[in-house]
Structures are given as C-alpha cells and as structure tokens.
Amino acid sequence: MSDAGAGGRLGGELDGFRIGYVPAGVGDLVTDFATEWDDVRFVSRVWERETAEGAWVDLRVHVLRGDRLATLADLRDFLAGYHERDADDPSLAEFHVGDAAGLIGPSEAFWLVAPGVGIDVIANPEAADSQELATVAQAILPLAG
C-alpha cells in the first residue's frame, strides 16, 4: 500500500503488521515501546502532539501476543482488565478486519488476528472520530511473508 488515502498518512510497520492509515489530525511525535502485562506481550506505537498543557496522545496501536488470547472473548476480557473497564461495555459493536472478528466502540477497536495474536487501537476522539478509527483498524494488515 503506497497511498494512505485522502488526508492520511502511512503508519509504518509494527511487530509483523503494516499500519496503512493514520488520520491527518494525529500528531507527529511517534514512540514505540514494548511491555508485558499478565502474561501478554505488547508492542505499541503511540502518536502524540504537543499542546500548551504538554503532550497529548492522539492514537495508540498495540499488537498483543499471548497464549491466553485464544478467542475474541478472551481478548475482550483481557483488555477490560488492562484498561480497568467493564468487559460487557454496551458501546462495543461487532466489526471485521478482513476475516478477523472484532469489536469497535467510539474510541477503541480490537480484534483477534489469530489465536494468541490481537490488535487494539485507541483513538482520541479529538484527533480521530469513530469513522477514522474504523479506517485505521481496517488498514492494519499482516506483513506478507
């Protein structure tokens, strides 16, 4: 994919995936990091922008890997614990990235790529609305190979 679409840009490669779209409203300060929580390994990319109050996080993409992420329900429950929220969030609706089933809400989309591998995308609504969040998610694809 050479073109990120109108008003967007490419997000690069992250732990075996290509981020094919980053909304124009997302800041240019980009940081990658890796961590582990409750036997799940995260490789993350964060986009920020400077404001008068300091740095503001606009977009986060996390690639999660762990045996406990066997199903979409496992991923949903894991993320609920990680983000300290209700696993039965009524704002989440079903959606798909290719053949992979996921859930999407106003500012977060996540899906199970394969057993043990999930993606979690969180967008600041001031930088990317729910439609752009869905576009970001749809543009995160495994690298060929």
What are these regions (language model features)?
Residues 1-5, 142-145:
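Soluble, non-membrane globular domain cores that form compact, hydrophobic packing
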Residues 2-108, 113-115:
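Short, solvent-exposed recognition patches
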Residues 120-145:
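Surface-exposed amphipathic alpha-helical segments
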